[in-house]
Amino acid sequence: MAKSSMKAREAKRAKLVAKFAEKRLALKAIISSPTTSDEDRWDAVLKLQALPRDSSSARQRNRCSQTGRPHGFLRKFGLSRIKLREATMRGEVPGLRKASW
């Protein structure tokens, strides 16, 4: 079980990413555009650097929705491998069962 502070930190990051997503996208479009002048590009780079560090989606970490475990996370289910196995054995995941061949 992850510390509640780590779960809260990830929730805060998710909120910041959502808040600054449009602004980051607009600045990145200015930076990557070949028609932008060097001065405008440099201003956009400085503005992008001034945004909060946690507003970048690359700083988010996928975590298990039940335990907060960061490793062994399966994106399709939103659970860690351990909790997915437990739920599968209880028959709570439709269409998923233990392999046997």
Swiss-Prot record:
Entry annotated with the keyword RNA-binding: yes
Alphabetical list of InterPro entries matching this protein: Ribosomal_uS14 (IPR001209), Ribosomal_uS14_bac/plastid (IPR023036), Ribosomal_uS14_CS (IPR018271)
GO cellular component, one term: cytoplasm
Tagged with keyword Metal-binding: no
Recorded GO MF terms: rRNA binding; structural constituent of ribosome
PROSITE patterns in the record: RIBOSOMAL_S14
Cross-referenced Pfam families: Ribosomal_S14
Record-level GO BP terms: translation
HAMAP family: Ribosomal_uS14_1
Family: Belongs to the universal ribosomal protein uS14 family.
Record-linked NCBIfam families: PRK08881.1
Reported function: Binds 16S rRNA, required for the assembly of 30S particles and may also be responsible for determining the conformation of the 16S rRNA at the A site.
Quaternary organization: Part of the 30S ribosomal subunit. Contacts proteins S3 and S10.
This protein's name: Small ribosomal subunit protein uS14
Record organism: Shewanella piezotolerans (strain WP3 / JCM 13877)
